[in-house]
Amino acid sequence: MLQSFKLAIRSIWGNKMRSFLTMLGIIIGVAAVIILVSLVNGYMGSVVESFASMGVNQINVNVTNLSSRSLDVDQMYAFYEDHTDLFGELSPNVTVSTTIKHGDDSMTTTSVSGKSEQYLDIKGYKLEQGRNISYSDIASRQKVCVVGNYVARELYGSAEEAIGETLKVGGYAFKIVGVVEVQDEENLEEGGTDDFVWLPYSVAVKMSRNANINSYTFTVLDTSKADQCKTLIESFLYETFKNDDLYHVTAMSELLDSLNEQIAMMSGMLGGIAGISLLVAGVGVMNIMLVSVTERTREIGIRKSLGAD
């Protein structure tokens, strides 16, 4: 055994370039497999985490209200109340395109939207200061708002100092009643996750001058029943509009499943490419071994004739 090992080492040392190229082929093949698999797993993890943070228990509804057939917020809430065994929260969504101001400072890229008192729970956010929008704020159309941490810091210096202050939204004065905790400390910037203002949706509807609300967000109590909940919503909307082109219902769990399928396909393709690289490296090693045996055929014969095993 020791003699064979010494002979192998001597053979490798005597063919340095050939040995180096052989090892290089194996190293490249193995490295390709490790790197590609690691990249895919890292990408998959980050994307899935990003989608999960958006809420896999959410169902988004977008409707097109026509003059002849429309869906008002009371109808949607009545449907929601009839199925509280399946749905967790509901929030209308009203986008308001406007500028916010405080004194001489203004912000033009801030996301301004109308939400319900349940939207904070839908997003899974927590308040750093103050309180959330309440049902009474919505019912009485109070000009109050909840702001993201970036807005509070940028216009008032801190979340604590922002509470109770006045914020001009589209020329109307709103009282800041709550500041949401930081969601993305690394991207606490203009247009980021923390750059938003939430108003009572009843007030936002008046500001947007839309007669009806076109967007809603539901959460489901059991994600395994997301498909059932989606079908239920679609049936309700079809009964209202009699035309399935006038609404679109999207379950986040479906998007996540579709994404996982695409990532699995990508992982398989990259794994196949890496496997081919390793196979090519293996063929190279076999080729070198065959060449080495061919070159030493005479030496092997002489050793055999002298009694070598």
Regions found by a protein language model. Give the residues of each.
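Bacterial inner-membrane juxtamembrane interface segments
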Residues: 1-309
